[in-house]
Amino acid sequence: MVYSYTEKKRIRKNFGKRPQVLDIPYLLSIQLDSFQKFIEQDPKGQQGLEAAFRSVFPIQSYSAHSELQYVNYRLGEPVFDVKECQIRGATYSAPLRVKLRLVVYEKEAPEGTVKDIKEQEVYMGEIPLMTENGTFVVNGTERVVVSQLHRSPGVFFDSDKGKTHSSGKVLYNARVIPYRGSWLDLEFDPKDNLFVRIDRRRKLPATIILRALDYSTTDILNLFFEKVRFEICNDKLEMNLVPERLRGETASFDIQINGKIYVEKGRRVTARHIRQLDKDQIQRIEVPVEYIIGKVVAQDYIDENTGELICSANTELSFDLLAKLSQAGHQQIETIFTNDLDHGDYISQTLKVDPTTDRLSALVEIYRMMRPGEPPTREAAENLFENLFFSEERYDLSAVGRMKFNRSLLRDEIEGSGILSKEDIIEVMKKLIGIRNGKGEIDDIDHLGNRRIRSVGEMAENQFRIGLVRVERAVKERLSLGDLDTLMPQDMINAKPISAAVKEFFGSSQLSQFMDQNNPLSEITHKRRISALGPGGLTRERAGFEVRDVHPTHYGKVCPIETPEGPNIGLINSLSVYACTNEYGFLETPYRSVHEGAVTNEIHYLSAIEEGNFVIAQANSNLDDNGYFIEDLVTCRNKGESSLFRKEQVDYMDVSTQQIVSVGASLIPFLEHDDANRALMGANMQRQAVPTLRADKPLVGTGMERAVAVDSGVTCVAKRGGSVQYVDASRIVIKVNENEMHPGEAGIDIYNLNKYTRSNQNTCINQIPCINLGELVERGNVLADGPSTDLGELALGQNMRVAFMPWNGYNFEDSILVSERVMQEDRFTTIQIQELACISRDTKLGSEEVTADIPNVGEAALSKLDESGIVYIGAEVNGGDILVGKVTPKGETQLSPEEKLLRAIFGEKASDVKDSSLRVPNGVSATVIDVQIFTRDGVEKDKRALEIEEMELKQVKKDLSEELKILEAALFGRIKAVLISGGITSEKLSRLPCERWLELPLSEEQKQEQLEQLAEQYDEMKAEFDKKMEVKRRKITQGDDLAPGVLKIVKVYLAVKRQIQPGDKMAGRHGNKGVISKINPVEDMPYDEEGNPVDIVLSPLGVPSRMNIGQILETHLGMAAKGIGNKINEMLKKNERVSKLRKFIQKAYDLGDGVCQTVDLSTFSDKEILSLAENLKKGMTIATPVFDGAKEKEIKQLLKLADLPTSGQINLFDGRTGEQFERPVTVGYMYMLKLNHLVDDKMHSRSTGSYSLVTQQPLGGKAQFGGQRFGEMEVWALEAYGAAYTLQEMLTVKSDDVNGRTKMYKNIVDGDHRMEAGIPESFNVLLKEIRSLGINIELEE
């Protein structure tokens, strides 16, 4: 296996037994690909912006004398880059420019004669762009658009499961769901009549829609029923016989021909009888007259002599009617064939309840249902019906809908029109009647073949189309207004509605969410999330148990583990590791193809629909060396069930054991030994881990850590290979390899690193280089670690030495006892960055001013501010300190004569302004790390703003100069090579300044040309440098675009150092969470025989009932990994020979049974071995993939190699007494996370604070500076104790007795500790409520 530069430094020993057939795909592709399709120009015009434009344009005027046509579009360049947008609070977007053509036709001339054509490019608003990490920057904050899982368009057959009607009868229904347009529902009622609903409105008999489609009663009966022909001859009645139709019926007369009785009266007709009738080729039989009575005629019958209608189609025959027909000379009578078994008379019955008789009355009935209260006209009724399902503007099934529709109706063709046809509606009815007759099955709505993914691109396209449709109306009006000779396309289009629609979607849609940026995993999970909520989806309240449940089709597509606990459980899911979407938006997962029992490496992606037809083996099925199944019977999945199949029957095999889980769950080692409920908590809690000060890779991982860290985009990854030219804390420069360079470029890549920036969750984002000068890197190698990454691997927490034992009750109820050493070594210290903003506005009384001259504030409070009134960078501030001094003008107050006199004597002038400075929130002590000032255009900048500007310009100039220097050096290197090859010695060159080299003449023409080309490049480079500098200077010095009425914004960034303390929440990766109960001195912690104390003591009772045994196995394996690290460390200390070191490390890597990934250290140089050993001395890193991890036996082998007891338990001694504990204790290394539930953010106490407006009771919650609720049950407690005075105090002066609490405050100030309780305000509220009901209550003194 080839290792990258960073991987060589620390290789994970992999315990996986199965080879990786398919690489893990790029984890953010679902977001990036979808958005790419949206903005990419699609020549077919089936998706993206192109599709939206083509669906709305051309727009014709009402008179059709002019039209506006769409030609093409282009996206411009964004004004600010991503970083600048975040700092300025802007949206990262590009202007959309559309080329439109205005065509005016001659009114008098023949149709289509063009009078005038004008073409122009029109600005159509801004389109937010996706960053390379799959996010959007909207108003300066990073947001993610979550994909939605919604019901696919198409036709669905379902039933009410017998819940609607009291009899428990199952009522079937069909629903045609378009991508956009009206829904069409067909449903049976308890009397078996078929009804239709349009858009869930009032129901109508289903035959109304058939009549509206211009079918007569006879046509309808011909469509849905087979016919039976009766003939009257010689006063006898004969019937044309189709023997199969008699099956299952009870004969009401003897069926006999020529004296031979086939079926006796009263007997049921069986298959044997039918075979006999077929054999004897019986086609007609005589039936008694009673047999035809009650049958329904299939057509109209007219008396040919008089032209009078005897009976219309769908009339039941009676004796009288039969006599009439016979008299009128009708010898043949056709009836419809129905029976109680499998040919129900539902349509015939429905026709009887249908009040309409012809097309017009049907259209009028539909119009009345859709538009109640409006008078119907023929034209209006026809237009309405036409627009419902047959107009491309109003109705679209979409390609997906048509494909699902045709598949459901078992048609061969899967493409077709986006609107419905007559045949479509009739076939849906036929299938629904077939299901009612017992043929066919209903659909499963929760099957992933019936639910599809709607990603960012598609949702943005829909929003954009909505905006365009709004514009279309306005354009139509303007085209019809006349005077088109002077108008240009620009005058037709108002971009506001389009911008508004797009802005609304990205800014406030339920699916456009504030990105969870706690750590790299939470980012990646958020982008791979799939929600069933949102517009056009489900709601929490209505979603039942079935929708939330794990469905067999989730396998390999949606993770069965990772979903939130609480009301959203099962509605918000996560994409599985290998899952992706197909062209129709259905989820697919990869499988290896199997031919005659041999598994190949050919990969096929199957969707849930296709998957059902195949037999699929699991990834852990045993194969021999040639890829054949070893066992004859293999556990496989087929049609959602698991069972044993012969190996020849297998069609496909899973790609990987981690195929079924999501990224979050695939990071939990020994997941297969954890209960699913705890695994769910573990996967969710990893997302809440706060990045620690120094990231520490997990000793026991799953091998997914590198993929997550690299794909999340928090690390800095080499775009092209080359050698490292320069490294410092904030920038890396790489000289690109010759073969990866573009022609004519200098071949230098410069990476500027993120330093101490704030994330959405206030955690700290900081990148640290992990390469050295002069080293060779390849494309895709990690150059710098981001937050929570260590050498390019995800590192959410710290490896801690844990012991499972009780310790003086400090680990009661999942509490955690932590050693003081953890705090001293800053293992779980985190940095939080808070942003505080001070806004200076223009008020009615004058503008607010940022200044250090604040009334009634002492010198001490101003000590950390500069002369502009803004805090210094580096100042250490505490709660209540002023960060930005600001004064607000206040209205003049009327002064008393005494005050005027004092004012005159002491000359206090600052009375007309009040202090409104920005202060540090209570309870925060922090360091100021950055200040940014934004000033409105046209407002004079203060001194501090100019200083900051100057500093930024200097920094930019320095950056660009260094960039230029590096590029120049590379270019002059190439110039030197040309000159030397042209015969000039390097000595001569060293005497001349570099710029002069370009003037040197060369004898060879080819060399001279090369030199001139390079000289041109040099001039271009300098010009480019000047241009870049000018652009940056303009951006920095121009005024900022601030909200109306805002003059200036000062943003102060504070860094808060959070050490671990009692009350903080910690967790492992297996759902084992707890709160720190005590930080214990190191000397009191339990220690082993060598005197090494443990770091954390966990409760052993947290394991058995929770059934997350994975944590115990992780602890044992962690102990073994650390033990091997210790042995390597000892060897390094003794300066052992490299060959011995190599041999020991090789032995550790080779351990295990049938491990597929072996490491060959013989290819490593001695230097690389030492570098590897240096990284392994703190513990050997191990990967145990999900469902394919280390076995107990292998853990024991590793413990043995590390000279540790194979039980995984050791004797511990009490740190306080030195006595040995009576039993050996499980001790090992577990990966612990500190979660973003810090006690500092939760701890809160209230002094006098805010009160509710109506009830005058104190508010609740930390954000409102509220108190603790003294609720109903607490009142009962005081009543039970008989503490009357305490109770009175609680319910009056401490709560809502306004006068009482004011009086009490005065009393306390006066030193008088008495209270007088009055009437609580809430009692007055009650009185008012009662009065509002018209009952007057008055209180007597």
Swiss-Prot record:
One of its GO terms (biological process) is DNA-templated transcription. The keyword Protein transport does not apply. Coiled coil: none annotated. The keyword Membrane does not apply. GO terms for molecular function: DNA binding; DNA-directed RNA polymerase activity; ribonucleoside binding. It catalyses: RNA(n) + a ribonucleoside 5'-triphosphate = RNA(n+1) + diphosphate. InterPro entries: DNA-dir_RNA_pol_bsu_ext_1_sf, DNA-dir_RNA_pol_bsu_external_1, DNA-dir_RNA_pol_su2, DNA-dir_RNAP_su2_dom, DNA-dir_RNAP_su2_hyb_sf, RNA_pol_bsu_bac, RNA_pol_bsu_CS, RNA_pol_bsu_protrusion. Its EC number is 2.7.7.6. It comes from the Bacteria. Belongs to the RNA polymerase beta chain family. This is DNA-directed RNA polymerase subunit beta.
